């Protein structure tokens, strides 16, 4: 049997598990990843997580700023049978989608057609979805509109975006290895996505992470869980930003204090009045400080009676 020519295109940590799986179970002829980007306070160039992993495996690497038909990557290699794409982050033009013999397939972190787009993990949590999953999709010219080869489901429960990211990263790698033999053998066809049920996971912004204390406590908890990687839910205390990393919603309350008021701060957490219900914060980060538990903070910085507010309400 002739060994298939497989290229891999990906950039962040989420893509590394799929690359690991391909190297372990099949082989990878070349890796595409984004160019090194400035990072950190010193703004020094930093390689992507996928580049670091590809270097570990001593795989050929290409880092084009954009894909040009006049200068295809890995021109010295045979044309690929398939390209596996995972969070690559660059636009794939039609000529590149058609370049591999069997086209390009994508690992997408949602149950398509729900949550097409840039932030499916976060939007699923924010919306209160009970489950999400992985879709292995045949790429076409649309935004995550291609036919689906395989989907695997995963309950969300109380997972944060960081926890769900790691779980879906591994599930995606498993799904890829499960379905890849069928795709390479052309043993069956992918299933077109349903015409109904599509929604879009728009890119995250820092502005939307600011907490509105008039909101329901359960909604705020979902926002905290959804944004724990980026942009991180936040509010203001005496004009200083405070980030929230973990919290739970408590039942309805009879407090007359305004929304945003801290009514209790003890070893259990920081209880804050919301438009409906009480938000109990478990972990947070004061301006210029490290992330700490609310219990640890209670020993040196008691917040009972203080008031959180939106920037435009100070």
UniProtKB/Swiss-Prot annotation:
Pfam family, one: Formyl_trans_N
Any one of the GO CC terms: cytosol
GO MF terms, alphabetically ordered: methionyl-tRNA formyltransferase activity
EC number: 2.1.2.9
Binding residues for (6S)-5,6,7,8-tetrahydrofolate: 110-113
Family in the record: Belongs to the Fmt family.
Name of the protein in its database record: Methionyl-tRNA formyltransferase
Lineage: Bacteria, Pseudomonadati, Pseudomonadota, Gammaproteobacteria, Cardiobacteriales
Gene designation: fmt
């Amino acid at each position: 049997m002739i060994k298939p020519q497989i290229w891999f295109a990906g950039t962040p940590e989420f893509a590394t598990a799929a690359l690991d799986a391909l190297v372990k179970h099949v082989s990878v002829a070349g890796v595409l990843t984004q160019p090194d980007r400035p990072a950190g306070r010193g703004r020094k160039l930093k390689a992507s997580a996928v580049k670091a992993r590809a270097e570990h495996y001593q795989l050929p690497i290409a880092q084009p700023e954009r894909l040009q038909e006049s200068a295809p990557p890995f021109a010295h290699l045979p044309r690929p049978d398939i390209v596996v794409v995972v969070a690559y982050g660059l636009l794939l033009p039609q000529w590149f989608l058609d370049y591999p013999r069997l086209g390009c397939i994508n690992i997408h972190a949602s149950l398509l057609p729900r949550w097409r787009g840039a932030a499916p993990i976060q939007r699923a949590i924010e919306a209160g979805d009970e489950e999400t999953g992985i879709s292995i999709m045949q790429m076409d010219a649309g935004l995550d509109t291609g036919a689906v080869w395989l989907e695997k489901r995963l309950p969300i429960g109380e997972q944060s975006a960081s926890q769900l990211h790691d779980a879906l990263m591994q599930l995606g790698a498993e799904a890829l290895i499960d379905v890849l033999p069928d795709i390479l053998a052309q043993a069956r066809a992918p299933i077109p996505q349903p015409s109904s049920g599509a929604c879009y996971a728009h890119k995250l912004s820092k502005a939307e992470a600011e907490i509105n204390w008039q909101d329901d406590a359960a909604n705020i908890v979902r926002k905290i869980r959804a944004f724990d990687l980026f942009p991180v839910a936040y509010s203001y205390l005496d004009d200083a930003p405070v980030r929230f990393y973990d919290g739970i919603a408590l039942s309805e309350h009879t407090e007359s204090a305004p929304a945003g008021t801290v009514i209790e701060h003890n070893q259990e957490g920081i209880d804050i009045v919301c438009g409906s219900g009480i938000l109990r914060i478990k972990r947070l980060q004061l301006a210029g400080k490290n992330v700490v538990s609310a219990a640890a903070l209670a020993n040196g910085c008691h917040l009972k009676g203080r008031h959180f507010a939106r920037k435009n309400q100070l």
